[in-house]
Amino acid sequence: MKNIILASASERRQELLKRILEDFQIIVSDFDESSIPFKDNIPSYVMNLAEGKARSVSKKIMDQDSNLVIGCDTLVAFNNKVLGKPKDKKDAFEMLQALSGNEHEVYSGLAILDVKSNKIITDFVCTKVKFSKLTSLQIEKYINTGDPMDKAGAYGIQGKAGVFVENINGCYYNVVGLPLNKLNSMLMEMGVNL
């Protein structure tokens, strides 16, 4: 059995991976996301970011050849504009105000790299999420919890912002940060049967 390494500091991703894998390591990627410019193709962009994270971690473990490294990146898109993590409370407010009453997309790029063979597979998942109309007070109260500050699009569906979601079309776990169904099929493609 290959050793599985998650190239992420995200507690949400770690919790989700524990649902399908009993044993894996965490090695945080030091990949510079700004090294990949966004060029209007969101699926390609998130897959490139995920691959960058996986390759960054693989360089740290070159002496261990029975490893598979999982890289993942999630972002929110609204009107073909990428919404990353908010810079500050004002930025979070503007993001949530834009999403209010509207549908947006959540994209996750996945990359799985076999360190020994250097074989890599990448894929992505897109989930459509529609928010109810939010009041300024709702947005401010949510921002004051601190919850949105480390999340793409300034919200976490698994937390208090779950009440903002009117409907979802696609993988719920993708919106949380790790699309388990897609990850499972990619792991199977790399010879890992869960």
UniProtKB/Swiss-Prot annotation:
Documented EC number(s): 3.6.1.9
GO CC entries: cytoplasm
CDD domains documented for this protein: Maf
Swiss-Prot/TrEMBL cofactor(s): a divalent metal cation
Localisation: Cytoplasm
Top class in the EC scheme: hydrolase
Active site (record annotation): D73
A Pfam match: Maf
Keywords for this protein: Cytoplasm, Hydrolase, Nucleotide metabolism
Catalytic activity: dTTP + H2O = dTMP + diphosphate + H(+); UTP + H2O = UMP + diphosphate + H(+)
Record-marked site positions (Important for substrate specificity): R12, T74, Q158
Family: Belongs to the Maf family. YhdE subfamily.
Role this protein plays: Nucleoside triphosphate pyrophosphatase that hydrolyzes dTTP and UTP. May have a dual role in cell division arrest and in preventing the incorporation of modified nucleotides into cellular nucleic acids.
UniProt-recorded name of the protein: dTTP/UTP pyrophosphatase
